[in-house]
Amino acid sequence: MKRIRTIAAVVAVAAVFATTACTSTPPGSSSDPSEKANLTFWSWVPGVDKAVDLWNKENPNIQVKLEQTPAGSSGTYAKMYSALKAGKGAPDLAQIEYQELPGFVLENGLVDLKPLGMGVESSKFVDWQLGQSTFGDSVYAVPQASGPMGLYYREDIFSALGLKAPATWDEYAVAAKTIHDANPAQYINTFAPGNSAWFTALAWQAGAKWFGLDGDTWTVNIDSDTTLKVASYWDKLREAGLIKTEPDFANGWYSDLQNGNIVAWPSAQWGGSILSGNAPTTAGKWKVAPLPQWDSTYASANWGGSSTAVLKGTSNAQAAEKFAVWLNTDPQSISLLLAGGYGWPAAKNALAGSTLDKPEEFLGGQNANKDVFKKSDESINTSWGWIPTTANTYTHLNDGFQAAVEGHGTFVDAVKAAQTATIADLEAKGLKVRAGD
Amino acid sequence: MTTTERAYTGKKGKNQSSKQPSTVQKPRKIQRSPGWRILVTAALAVAAVYFLFPVYWLTIAATKSTSSLFGSSGLALDNPQLLTNLVNVVTYNGGIFGRWALNSVLYSGVGAVVATICSLAAGYCLAKFTFRGREVWFNIILAGVMIPGTALALPLFLLMSQVGLVNTYWSVLLPSLVSPFGVYLGRIYAQAAVPDSLLEASRLDGAGEFRIFFTLVLRLMMPAAVTIFLFQFIGIWNNFFLPLVMLSDQSLYPITLGLVQWQSVSDRHPELYQLAIGGAFLSVIPIMIAIVSLQRFWKAGLTEGSVKG
Amino acid sequence: MVLPLVYAIYESVTGIQRSGAFGQGGSSPVFVGLDNYITALGASAFVASLGRVLLFAVVQVPVMIILATALALLLDAASAWGVRFFRSAYFLPYGVPGVIASILWGFLYTPGLSPLVNFGSALGLNLDFLGGGSILWSIANIVTWQYAGYNMLVIVAQLKSIDADLFEAASIDGANAWQVITRIKLPLIRPAIVLTTVFTIIGTIQLFAEPLVLKPLSSAITSSFTPNLSAYNEAFANNNYNLAAAESVLLALVACAFSFGFLKLVTRGGSPS
């Protein structure tokens, strides 16, 4: 076929061009920081645009071009992986959540930042967050922020019903019933079946530890009694019709927050900016309480911690490292990111005197960071780690949760199925794996 | 001959002389009572409401601020601010929307023109030249019509990444140049509309094969060309999977990808809802106007090219 | 066209072997035969997604074709006012790309935003467009909205090419409108109907953009809702390109089998008059 042959020829010619282009420009390893550099940076963190503007003003030689992307698991990780696979089109820098870092390391997609300066800078960061981006002897990302959890709730609606912020999950279930009984349109929260990262954080809080590494062998322990306890707790609320099961971060949910049909949200510190951005008319009516507890010892969890990583194929790894460290340690940058609501800083001593330590109008004047999140951050079980196929595990949980919501099986079933499927995922990657801790 | 082929060739013998059968002045309608007429019009009107309702909603929504988008009825105006919204759309992020629009036009325009010429040439070769494996090629093309384009997008990505073309204009353009349906249509049409005697005569006059194709055959196959062009243009314009897989650089995005990007970013940046809606409005309205005003060509192309062939 | 398929088949029989917790010990592609196909067909979610698009096709295709044919016949009857306006109105959505149509309808399906849901609840109806029982048909509605007008136009074009003498003869013979439709029009537009049917089958089996856009709005759409979604997810979220390639090949085979099967069926069913 003439046409196909022509195309084949064009492809071949283009391929030759591409190869010559590759060989004529050496891979970006030049390490002179005074050299001009143009970097692209993918991020979805609110407020990061202002920090980037500030950097660009102060560093005319290293210009960063920010591209605001959808949240990582909403397609941006897919784009990064495909660009890495293709060997081109990946950004120099990217936002990567902690649970996704091992996956990028496995695909050989990240630059080891330790020899570029992170080795020296690492003392600036909170240990456990630094641990999330350290694999073996390498540091693959600059920690940015974590998401210590708390309970956002509509204080006005709770107190009208004579409810206090629930201190335990049992009290939470009682509150769920009181709220729904008083007004059938109202629910305490939604169990978003498509957002298993949220469920994972709740299991984390309950004391579960899903993943580990024993020498070269990955361990998977998702279906532990602890996790099953959490799953069956939400199963009971769902079966009693006391919670919604609509997707979070979606129009319907925003609409429910706005009109008071959803009155609470066990969420992370960064959740406040989501609420204030999407339900502006409810300002002043929210408060934050510590996450409800399972036991007498206070425990919290992290949801949505994130880092800034330098991707393979960058034109200037040194400049990129410099920017990534600045972004996450410079006081001015941190306060811009805090204003956007990026989470809890990974840099040490960021609370005192910063914009974090002040009352918030949206929360009716509560200083939630000081009251709740500081202690929450200190009570996270920091031994939690991830596996290179965390995204698959989330998918399995999502699929199982969605099936349960549609009336096929339960959340407990979903957790059990995810255990088996996760072991198969790691095996499919050609890795060694076993069940248990 | 398959049935689809008959779809194109079914009427060829009869209508070759009259190019526009619809204009033949004969009483083709049987007159009905007014009651019947009202009934039919009512049925058509109900269908029209269904097809136009989302367009109406989009138009109303495009005039709203983000807060009244969520806080007011979707059917009525509420402090209309269409102009502000549209200015936001075209100026956001350094005018990236205009870039996406141009990209869409580039992918669709160039893709459709080249695909049309290639398809006609290939179809003509398949129809008028005998060479080894001709039927095999034609059957491959036929199978190509049946294979969903999206099933090929992923393999194409892997292939393009091998040759380093991913995330370039080429990665979306090259696959768009291939139109098995166009080749198929080209062959059917060439069989019917290009008389062998005319070719013989030109060859006797000493015209080269290329000249014959570009001066004579292309002209004869114009109606098929219009159909293939429009078909391919809309196909590329609407394509989503291929650019999604191929492109990671936002400045290469077509409109479809860009708007989905805005829509999915909006979970953390609520102001982008209004941009996504305003962008949808801006991109849909011109195409709708174009489609309706080009309806004549669609019809002509379909009648001449597909149905009558 | 042939090249990507061949390459897909090559990728689909390949797997990967690694050593070390992060593959530091090196990784290499290995020939795994039909393992990826066995994995794909052994995964209940992927098989369910194939079943889902087939169910979708079985319902969607007749609805689409009947609607398009009915609209074409009504327009052609020309007993109505404003035929030109109606024809344009029906054809208009064809210019709206699938993803944009999905964004649009997504808003119209969302409780709290949608005038349709509000209207329904005012009437005491609890309309749930995004739930597990209805989401597939909500998607079908988007597809129908987008393409019914186009299919109608193809059929209208063939109706126009019917020789007017036939109608004259029919009216002289005293045929009524229904007889004209069933005896003359329908048999003569059969080729156009076959054509639109084949294209509708191919279109429905490759369902991707609509569920992708609606996924964040609906709990019922999983990452493997359709075969294409599953392949996309395997390739780019899970980095399992080999499995994704196998799924693409399977999808192409199913689509081919269906379209050819349909063509065989109508060809054997006797030739149109």
Locations of the language-model features?
Chain A
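A structural signal for short loop-to-beta-strand junctions that line the ligand-binding cleft
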Residues: 90-92, 120-157, 187, 297-301, ...
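Short, low-complexity disordered leader/linker segments with a strong preference
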Residues: 1-39, 57, 413, 423-437
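Extracytoplasmic/periplasmic solute-binding protein
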Residues: 135-144, 149, 173-220, 226, ...
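Hinge/lid segment of periplasmic solute-binding proteins
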Residues: 98-148, 202, 285-289, 370-372, ...
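Extracytoplasmic "Venus flytrap"/periplasmic binding protein-like
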Residues: 57-127, 160-167, 256, 260-265, ...
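Glycine-centered hinge/linker elements that transmit conformational signals in sensory
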Residues: 176, 217-247, 291
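Conserved C-terminal helix/tail region of periplasmic/extracytoplasmic solute-binding proteins
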Residues: 159, 376-437
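C-terminal lobe and pocket-closing loops
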Residues: 102, 270-282, 294-396, 433-437
